[in-house]
Structure formats: C-alpha cells, structure tokens
Curated annotation (Swiss-Prot):
GO cellular component: endoplasmic reticulum membrane; membrane
Family annotation (PANTHER family): 24-HYDROXYCHOLESTEROL 7-ALPHA-HYDROXYLASE, CYTOCHROME P450 FAMILY 7
Membrane topology of the entry: Single-pass membrane protein
Protein name per Swiss-Prot or TrEMBL: Lanosterol 14-alpha demethylase
Tissues and organs where the protein is expressed, per its UniProt entry: Ubiquitously expressed with highest levels in testis, ovary, adrenal, prostate, liver, kidney and lung.
Keyword Nucleus: no
GO BP of this protein: cholesterol biosynthetic process; cholesterol biosynthetic process via 24,25-dihydrolanosterol; negative regulation of amyloid-beta clearance; negative regulation of protein catabolic process; negative regulation of protein secretion; steroid biosynthetic process; sterol metabolic process
Entry's family note: Belongs to the cytochrome P450 family.
Protein source organism: Homo sapiens
Primary subcellular site in the record, as a coarse category: endoplasmic reticulum
Residue spans crossing the bilayer: 30-50
Amino acid sequence: MAAAAGMLLLGLLQAGGSVLGQAMEKVTGGNLLSMLLIACAFTLSLVYLIRLAAGHLVQLPAGVKSPPYIFSPIPFLGHAIAFGKSPIEFLENAYEKYGPVFSFTMVGKTFTYLLGSDAAALLFNSKNEDLNAEDVYSRLTTPVFGKGVAYDVPNPVFLEQKKMLKSGLNIAHFKQHVSIIEKETKEYFESWGESGEKNVFEALSELIILTASHCLHGKEIRSQLNEKVAQLYADLDGGFSHAAWLLPGWLPLPSFRRRDRAHREIKDIFYKAIQKRRQSQEKIDDILQTLLDATYKDGRPLTDDEVAGMLIGLLLAGQHTSSTTSAWMGFFLARDKTLQKKCYLEQKTVCGENLPPLTYDQLKDLNLLDRCIKETLRLRPPIMIMMRMARTPQTVAGYTIPPGHQVCVSPTVNQRLKDSWVERLDFNPDRYLQDNPASGEKFAYVPFGAGRHRCIGENFAYVQIKTIWSTMLRLYEFDLIDGYFPTVNYTTMIHTPENPVIRYKRRSK
C-alpha cells in the first residue's frame, strides 16, 4: 500500500509539473510574479493532497481514541473561513458540542484544542521534545528577531538566553524605569492639548515603543528613535502576520520585503550602539550591559548579533501585550466612569493629594489599578492562541493526539468559560479580591502563558502599564464617543480594538 501511494504521489508531481508549466505560460503571459503565485497555490494544494494520502496510511493502534474531529467539506481550507471570521464563537460552540478536546483542519493543518484548565495542563506541563514550540513559531520569529536567538536555536540555548534577559528584568531596574516611563508619557501627551478625540491604540503603541526602548535598550539606542526608526519598528512588527505564518518566507511580498529591510537597518543601529558601549568601557546598569556581560554555561559570551536579536525580541514581544492591554483598559475605564474616578482617587490616596512623581513602591500599592489590568487581560488577552507541535503521541481526557497536530490553548476562551468564572463576561476587577476567582483552577487564567514558556516580561509589563495609566489618569478624563465600545479586530495576529478612538479632556488643576 505504501509503495502504491508513493507511485501515486510521484505521478501527481510529474503530471502536475507538466500541466503547470504549460498553463502558466498561457495564463500569465510569462509574468514572473503571477507565475510564482500560481506555483505557490499549486504547491500548497499538492502538499495538502500528500498529507491527506499520508494520513490514510497511518493506522491508530487498537483501543486508541483520537479526539473528536469537526468535519469540513471544504478541502485544504477546512474551517479557516468560519474560524477567521469569529474564532472565539467557533471555539466556544465546539467546546459546548464536543467537550474540552477536539480537532479540526485549516489550510492543510490539523489543530487540536485543549479548552479548560484540566485539558490545558497537557500543554503547559509538557516537555519541549513532546510538544514543541520552535516547530510552530520559528517561521514567524526568525525573520523578525534574526538567526541564533529565540526559536531559531535548540530549546536549552533559548532557555539560557531567557535566563540572561530575566536577570536584567529585576526590581532595581524597575525602580529606575518608573521615572523614565513617567517622563516619556508626560512628554508624549503634551501634543494632545486640552481635549479632543484620538486613536488611543496608535498613541499607546508609539508610547510603548518609546518607553520600552528607553528602559530595555538603553539611552544610546533610545536617542536614535526618531520617526524613521519608529517606522522601521512598525515594518518589522508587520512580520507577525497571518501571511508570514502560512506562506514561505522567500515570497517577494511587500510586507516581507519591508520586514527584512527593517531588520537589517535596526540591527545596524544596534551594532553601532553595542560597539560604542564596548569601546567606552563604561559600565551602565541596564539590560544592554547585562547582555554584554552575560555568558553561556560553557563560558562563551554573546555575539553582537545575538545581543541585537535578543534586544529586538525583548522589545517586540512585550510591545504587543502592553499596547493592546493598555488600549483595551482605556475603553473599559471610559465605559465605567465610576471605576475611572475610583482609579483617579486611588492615585491621591496612595501617592498624595498633590500627586508627586511616581515611585516603584507607590506603584505596588495601586491595587485597584492592578486589578483593572488583570481583568483587562482576562477579557482581552492580546494573544488569543498558544500553540505547540506534537512530536510524540499525547494523551489527554481519554484521547490520543497523534504527532503532527498543532496543539493549542486559547487563553481568551479559558478565561471566560462559564464552568470557571462567575459573571464571566462582566468587567469586574473586584473579583480578584478573592483568593481563587476561577474556582481555584490552575490554568484558567493564563494571559502570560505558564510553564517553561511563561512570558519573562510580565513584571515589566505591569510596571510599564501601571506607570503609563497612572500618568494618563492624572492628566485626563476619558469618555466613549457616543457610547461606542470597540469590537475585536480578528484580522491581525494580536487581537486589537476595532476603530479605537476615545474622547479625552484635561483635568482641571
């Protein structure tokens, strides 16, 4: 059977190549880009047929149950259209019908979802050799961060790199960061004037880049962050797209070209800053210096290319979380003016009636603001899906997931399951006054992930968001425009607010 299948697939390749060559000349008139796109479409379809044929050759062992499979009559695309249109509704409906574990196909790939705390434990407790992260994320991150870092290296090396970065994300540095972020925020909002309507997501995205670059990259790199460099960051960030995940990286797409050019130019800026720091022999207590002084277990120091790649990764990985969360929280506070007033009064209670400059210790005592961030992350986690590739068979809830499946957990769904959360769709920061707001379930609340791949920048994100919003609340009152509260934009990898324009008015002194 295997030999017959192999001959069949070989025949498909030969016949397809002949037909494709003749057809492309007629249809495209020899246009290179058109021929390339048709070739890609043919290749994708052929890959799907090969996987389909190979799948039929695999026989499950007797007594092994595969997860419930949601059938689609549409070849290759599968449920991609329905899922892309409303992913949360799709997953919640599947959970109601099939339970916590189920599979379906999109664009030739099979996805198995683990919903609810018990099922999600498989992913968060797994070893990397069983449920692998690099197999899923490397094609997205490597063109953006560069080779030799993050998911482009073996997991033990990546863990060493994360440990180096984490050592620089410490309380001593956070205490320095608060005043830096407050100053950057005040300067940024000087241009807003007394009142108006602004796209708060765009504004906060720009501000997050400014503050993160200053805190995480050092003064040398921050001093070069002008409009041109900000656009380079935006182009680089554009590499985190559905197209980058689904399509080969060598395709001559405009967004891919912009990403690759931005990567080269930003690294050149970093190389100059790194060389300047090395040559000066000046020891500045920041993350750049932490990386320059760091060594692997075998004693090898980081190369300039590794340092630059890790700095890019540190900035962009956190930029999404902070900018999206900050924007969504603004709309939740604008919708609930009573809560917004309480957050403002908390500033005076904790920091003093005259609202002096913020300190790290004061920031820690802003408990209501802290709970507002937590609740925003519950209802609007920036990353809707966390994925791993199954390399070995995995058993969960009585089902066996075969190798080759992309195994997924959705924080968005887990964080509002009616089985786990009381008044699950309500924005209620006071739910965190309880010790176990999610019935004590370990993986019911995972906006920063869990286990070996938990986000190392969580504490910095809280410092950054709390400082920015403390400053914004001191400066302005915020309102929805004609009661409009944004819907979720599902067309991007990070789920941002749709048309995020907010109304503001400067507080009277």
